Amino acid sequence: MPSSENSFTNKLVQLGSSCLQVTPICLGTMTFGEQVDEPTAHRILDFAVERGINFLDTAEMYAVPPRRETYNATEKIIGNWLAKRPDVRKQLVIATKIAGPSRGMDWIRNGSADVTEKDFLEACDASLKRLQTDVIDLYQIHWPLRHVPAFGGVYFDPTKDKPVTPILAQLQALDKLVKAGKVRAIGLSNETPYGVSEFVHLAEKHGLTKIATVQNPYCLVNRTLENGLDETMHRLGVSNIPYSPLGFGLLTGKYDKSGLIGEGAPANARLTKFEQNRKQRWGRPESLVAARRYNALA
């Protein structure tokens, strides 16, 4: 058992209006199956649980950076770990995500530009099978079906809008999963204030399951959440699950001297190893400049 000094179990937080109670620290797993092999991933999971952490987050798309060869790998690794530790499952809150439209990943639902009700139901069943569990505690939409300026984007471009499954139909599909006992609570990720408001108001209007959470990036080098999403979540009773709280490692200080690439850069670090990650929000020169200044204050 974890010692009381290291345990987080006495600080449980309720997720939105759901029944889920989680530790303030959630173990993100998106590197499992890419940078982290299965035996190492299992040791990390053991380490977290031994210290009282009860909250795990994954996704059908993982590992990252996304590749055809590692699609679904993270859920499978977690499922294998759970199978070897059957008594652990009841202690945990396991969150996973259904991928949104393909964004160039043609190995996800054949590159479809939409996610239908059938896709929601089939994706959930597939995640349950990979995770080797009979229920997903928190099922999230990884990114919106409609066009939004996500993953480092800033400005909304209405000319990029395309017809997709309406938010009401998405809610109805998720509600079916809850009523079927396959999902306990639902959430969103990489969402906007508009999207959160629509999901909440339509759920209330039609008597459907209300979203409990929004998982968006939030840290000292990415504060876009403060541009209205924080107020929206507060007033609508939706919890925030901030991801990348250390800015993909920028706020650890490991890039301060060397920069992201070149001599002295940490060879196995994500922003050094994967160009795709540098091209998005975390590899921008201004992000590293800001991180260095924050790290100097720490």
Residue positions per predicted region:
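A general structural detector for well-ordered alpha-helical segments in enzyme core domains, enriched
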Residues: 44, 74-81, 123, 127, ...
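N-terminal small/glycine-rich loop or linker at the start of catalytic domains
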Residues: 16-35, 95-111, 140, 144-154
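Alpha-helix N-cap and loop-to-helix initiation/capping positions
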Residues: 36, 40, 69-73, 77, ...
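Short, acidic/polar
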Residues: 36-48, 116-130, 196-200
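Beta/alpha (TIM)-barrel catalytic core signal, keyed to glycine-rich beta->alpha loops juxtaposed to Asp/Glu
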Residues: 9, 144-298
